[in-house]
Amino acid sequence: MDILQLAPTHLLAILLSSTSALFLITYLLRAGHRPSDLPNGPPTVPLFGNELQVPKSDAHFQFSRWAKEYGGFFTLKRYNNTTIVISDQKLIKTLLDKKSNIYSHRPASLVSHLITQSDHLLVMQYGERWRMLRKTIHQYFMEPRCERDHWKVQEAEAKQMLHDYLTMPEDHMLHPKRYSNSITNSLVFGIRTKTVHDEYMKKLFYLMDKWSLVQELGATPPVDSFALLRYVPQWMLGNWRNRAVEVGDLMQSLYQTVLDQVKERRQRGIQRDSFMDRVLDTLKQTPLSENELRFLGGVLMEGGSDTSSSLILTIIQAMTKYPEVQAKAHAQIDSIIGHNRSPAWSDWSKLPYINMIIKESHRWRPVSPLGVPHAVAEDDHIDGKLIPQGSSIVLNVWGMHHDSDRWQEPEHFQPERFADFPALASGYAGSERRDHLGYGAGRRICPGIHLAERNLIIGIAKLLWAFEFLEPLGSDSDISAHSGASKGFLHCPKDYGCVIRLRSPEKRETIMREFAEAQEVFARFD
């Protein structure tokens, strides 16, 4: 048949079909391809790019191997999406700090939206709304406020933590969780976590375990890179949507329950100087939706509870494996503090070795080995290589913290590495000479950094003043970074055995007395 004899509608159909086929073929040929103007990286395959090479768990180990081969920044192609992995700490200053106006965004994420409806500060897109919520948090947790007020709650909760270790050593994996969670909930909601059996605490850490697994890089099918996967039956792809919705439901339920408790207390005429009370007092000036209120409190509950407790558990485990470090800490504490009182926040500058131990724990076992991905808002260039607009920017925190060119024998726990870093972590954030990346970088740096540093210093100083931590006879706890920690985008040591030995009878009396004195602070939250 002569094509000229076809009806115009048939000709149009053929033309559209041919154009669509050509477009699809071109897309498939280009998808997964790494253009030459992008940073180098591992070889790609058509369509998939590097998707099949990215591990579904613990990707930071593979990223660190690739960094040795391809340099401090390299490109991964995931279908048509571009991911830039940074393993050179100098680039953190160059990009995320100096160009924070374009490197503070987040990659689009359907999973994050399903969980939070995009109202969670951690995954919220950078913009006016994000800046407003961030400012709200900063005003309550800025350093002067921590120095003036919050340390009293922190010291009281640390005194209970000593009492808990002394009287319930069998729950040693839970005491740091109660400590950090109670500080956070007291300051954010005016609600204490009185025991390790608290229902809010149990639900939060269960939720965090679930969310950590869902949010880990590589754990979810690339539904943002290859949208057609959204229409594949999810049972063929690990039930990714159901997993996300489950986490979202857990968040909504817990955060709404706590928020409702604050509102009910206020309706009874009981006001407290908590973060959420202040937010509710200013709703007319700063209107927030119910979902924004839920997640504003929730993000603080998460960040304030999980990171500090994970690091305290890491440090205690390190003490059992590195007794010479523990002995040195004991000696310094004993030279400053006697038996009649435990260390206080006011002692921190006299206990530099405690500060070194905390910095080394951030380096040795970072809680978030790959951080939370950033996204670049416009085209940028590094050393003549293009960083395309919309690229995901992954900070290989693990690789930078375990770079043998900077850290000799990086797998060893050696606090002396930080002898020349006497200030708190906030003093080095954004500087050329950074101690670690445990709190993130750029404008997305943890807004609770000042509170978290004090949680750790007060808690660890008191614990090492009071106790010696030992491995049980005949046991060998697993401190391997590959097998000794939980999976997900947040890492915490797996349960380990520990013998907790009181360092002197006099300290028992001090612990009991200080716990009784702490009740005066706790009474504010009854």
From Swiss-Prot:
GO terms for biological process: patulin biosynthetic process. The keyword Transmembrane helix applies. GO terms for molecular function: heme binding; iron ion binding; monooxygenase activity; oxidoreductase activity, acting on paired donors, with incorporation or reduction of molecular oxygen; polyketide synthase activity. Disruption phenotype: Completely abolishes the production of patulin and shows significant slower colony expansion. Residues 30-526 are lumenal. Keywords: Endoplasmic reticulum, Glycoprotein, Iron, Membrane, Metal-binding, Monooxygenase, Oxidoreductase, Transmembrane, Transmembrane helix. It is found in: Endoplasmic reticulum membrane. Residues 1-6 are cytoplasmic. Belongs to the cytochrome P450 family. Cytochrome P450 monooxygenase; part of the gene cluster that mediates the biosynthesis of patulin, an acetate-derived tetraketide mycotoxin produced by several fungal species that shows antimicrobial properties against several bacteria. PatI catalyzes the conversion of m-hydroxybenzyl alcohol into gentisyl alcohol. The pathway begins with the synthesis of 6-methylsalicylic acid by the polyketide synthase (PKS) patK via condensation of acetate and malonate units. This is Cytochrome P450 monooxygenase patI. The lineage of its organism: Eukaryota, Fungi, Dikarya, Ascomycota, Pezizomycotina. The gene is patI.
